[in-house]
Amino acid sequence: MAQVQYIGTGRRKSSVARVRLVPGTGKIVINKREIEEYVPFAALREVIKQPLVATETTGSYDIHVNVNGGGYTGQAGAVRHGIARALLQVDPDFRAALKSAGLLTRDSRMKERKKPGLRGARRAPQFSKR
């Protein structure tokens, strides 16, 4: 018999996370590595676990994640978004808790592009009066 699994896709900045929730003990595996090994910062590990805390499902599901693109923060945000979406498939009643915590909203903030004639997106070259 096929094992029950719930799938969610999360995005943040340039990162995309494909998340699989399987009933289990609460183990989180990201790109075939344990969460402690893959995410070096405790604060980002907490960000990833926010949807589980909001729905009080910590320890109920094993989470397998494939994530690519971006850096630590973008990937953590993408995984969080993916877990929240997968939890919606588990139980649609979670929507209220997840939405009030702001976990279902795709964070649309992106890096602003560099403009010609400037050193960065907004940083201008040094101005000399004389």
UniProtKB/Swiss-Prot annotation:
GO terms for molecular function: RNA binding; structural constituent of ribosome. Residues 105-130 are annotated as: Disordered. PROSITE patterns: RIBOSOMAL_S9. GO terms for biological process: translation. Gene3D superfamilies: 3.30.230.10. Signal peptide: none annotated. Keywords: Ribonucleoprotein, Ribosomal protein. Residues 111-130 have a biased composition (Basic residues). One of its GO terms (cellular component) is cytosolic small ribosomal subunit. InterPro entries: Ribosomal_Su5_D2-typ_SF (IPR020568), Ribosomal_uS9 (IPR000754), Ribosomal_uS9_bac/plastid (IPR023035), Ribosomal_uS9_CS (IPR020574), Ribsml_uS5_D2-typ_fold_subgr (IPR014721). PANTHER family: RIBOSOMAL PROTEIN S9, SMALL RIBOSOMAL SUBUNIT PROTEIN US9M. Belongs to the universal ribosomal protein uS9 family. NCBIfam families: PRK00132.1 (NF001099). HAMAP family: Ribosomal_uS9_B (MF_00532_B). This is Small ribosomal subunit protein uS9. It comes from Lysinibacillus sphaericus (strain C3-41).
